Amino acid sequence: LNPHILFLVNNQKSNPNTNPKTIILLRLLITFVKKIIMSKPVRVRFAPSPTGPLHMGGVRTALYNYLFAKKHKGTFLIRIEDTDQTRFVPGAQEYIMDALSWCGIMPSEGPGLGGEFGPYVQSERKAMYRPYAEELVAKEHAYYAFDTAEELEQMREQAKQMGMPNWQYNSVTRVSMKNSLTLPHTEVEQRLANGDPYVIRMKMPRNEDVRFHDLIRGWVVVNTNNLDDKVLFKSDGMPTYHLANIVDDYTMNISHVIRGEEWLPSAPLHVLLYQAFGWDAPEFAHLPLLLRPDGNGKLSKRDGDRLGFPVFPTNWITAEGELYSGYREKGYLPEAFINMLALLGWNPGTPQEIFTLDELVEAFSLERVSKSGAKFDPEKTKWFQQSWLRMQADADIAKGLKETNPTLNISDSALETLVGLMKERATFAEDILTDGAYFLANPSEFDTETIRKKWKAETSGYLNEWMDRLTGISEFNSANIETAFKGYLEEKGLGIGAVLLPYRLSVTGVGAGPGMFDVSAFLGKEEVLTRMKENLPKIAAILNEA
């Protein structure tokens, strides 16, 4: 009702003779209708098919449903749509649930979760769909079709030969096909009694406009002459996606259907099915596509790893043992992954980019979801990860590193200190150990390029003198080391660059890192002096090779 009133408002505004009070009254009516609509319990669903791993676009759909439900104090459920058993992939359903759990957006109803509208797997609801299909036939909105696969293929070939490559079973061609609209009633009854294979097809009305309002895209109008007579019920006794989807959404009291743009072409059929049953349709919202980084085409499952980044939330291993990488195993935090996905197609209307899940719930609205596709940016994704890693407590990161590296030989307190020194420079938690390996052991490799560029003839002499100063520091902490270092530079009349970088290279082997006085304090006096004594001859050998 609300979209129809909005349509009236727009028409009245364009009419110069319209009384302004009329527009005001219509707008008040819109507000009233919105209150009525939102007074109904919000129930949304994420309805993936278990045909393989869950693509990040699917995770975004689940996320937007979750945010919308939480925003409106509603219910978010998951329904597994496995009507196409030929494409069923073992393990896919478990993968989907595990991925949602890792992302922190678990539904409150679904397989294994309970709920009063179950079962939540369509193959387990098989018995309930046939009566609905038969009801449509009885109401003359659908019909039995007995055409065999061979006969349909023959029709397609004939159409191609006549210059019509895109043959469809529709309101025009159905009159020449083998179905209950063309066969005598007695023959239809006999075929059904004999158990002849058949499907039930939607009887698409001819030359009618189907109008519906999309919460993201506005009004959508499609003429039925552009639609074919889709199969609703298959010969194997299973419904197709279209029938099962409508029946399940209705019987599960779904208030809003929030799904990907790829389902927009099916929406007119779904609207007609609701009308045929005499049911109120839910609100529709079709989300924009996720695009490749260059903007050329949809980001697909086949792009996984091929473009240099994952497209799945977690690792997926095929039956043949082929691995497709996921964000979890790459080291991404779920908070960073979800934060990134939320902003792929939705704009909060403010400069804010870092959101907790609760903040996303508070800020989210379908009105700010874009109509156009959203380009995925792998570098921006790393930025979100870096930002979220820096927000983590040092103790939590250290605990995680101990869990993933059980042989790590370092105390909890020391590791926590190491994390504090390194996390500002890291993208992933594991970078702290790989990039900061010199904290745990004397380096076996050196930044030879920097050594050759920065090492002067007098540098080794300065470092030997600096070692003597280090030996004399009684309380070996960062502040005392810095004070001694500045005193040495002042005494010798040297600039900081003449000694600090060579000092770093002789202790860590690398030319950059956390503050060198902090690094020195972490390692301790004995370790620093031992390393310098061992490494200065190695550096001299590198210089001699040059």
Regions found by a protein language model. Name each.
Residues 394-492:
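Small-residue-rich helix-loop
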Residues 143-144, 148-303, 310, 323, ...:
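Active-site cores that bind ATP or allylic diphosphates and position pyrophosphate for catalysis
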Residues 119-123, 146, 233-234, 252-263, ...:
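Conserved phosphate-binding loops in nucleotide/dinucleotide-binding enzymes
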Residues 1, 6-8, 12, 16, ...:
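Short hydrophobic targeting helices and cationic amphipathic motifs
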Residues 65, 96, 136, 140, ...:
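Residue-level signal for inorganic ion chemistry
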Residues 39-164, 265-276, 336:
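N-terminal Rossmann-like or analogous alpha/beta NTP/dinucleotide-binding catalytic cores
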Residues 21-37:
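Short, Lys/Arg-enriched N-terminal segments with co-localized hydrophobic residues
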Residues 478-543:
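Charged substrate- and nucleic-acid-binding regions of tRNA-handling and nucleotidyl-transfer enzymes
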